[in-house]
Amino acid sequence: MFLTERDLKENFWKNYNYSARAIRYQFEAPIREGCADLITVEMYQDNVQFNSFEFKLHDIKKAILQAKENSKYVHKSWIVI
């Protein structure tokens, strides 16, 4: 359980990227109005893949809308709750 979205982001990132799977990454990436919470560039099956992540503890409806908007610019768009 996390009290803040920042705690959620930090804990997620520590566990997600423990093996340095992301070639590059940026928090608060300006790919759309309002910024995506996290964008990663990764190699997946010998192909470069762009992923976006939205972190939400509340307002899941907003997270879905943000992830849908992000999906226009990335290969996969994820919601972390």
Per-range role (PLM):
Residues M1-G34, Y44:
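Acidic-basic catalytic patches of nuclease active cores, encompassing PD-(D/E)XK
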Residues F12, L38-T40, Q49-D59:
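Conserved catalytic cores of phosphodiester-cleaving nucleases, focusing on short active-site segments
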Residues P30-E33, H58-K62:
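Short secondary-structure boundary/capping elements
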Residues I31, S71-K72:
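A sequence-level detector of short, solvent-exposed, charge-rich linear segments
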Residues G34, Q49-N51, H75:
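A generic structural signal for short beta-strands and their flanking turns/coil linkers
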Residues Q45-N47, K72:
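Flexible, charged surface loops at secondary-structure boundaries
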Residues K56-I60, V74-I81:
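Nucleic-acid nuclease catalytic cores
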Residues I64-E69:
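A short acidic, amphipathic alpha-helical/loop segment
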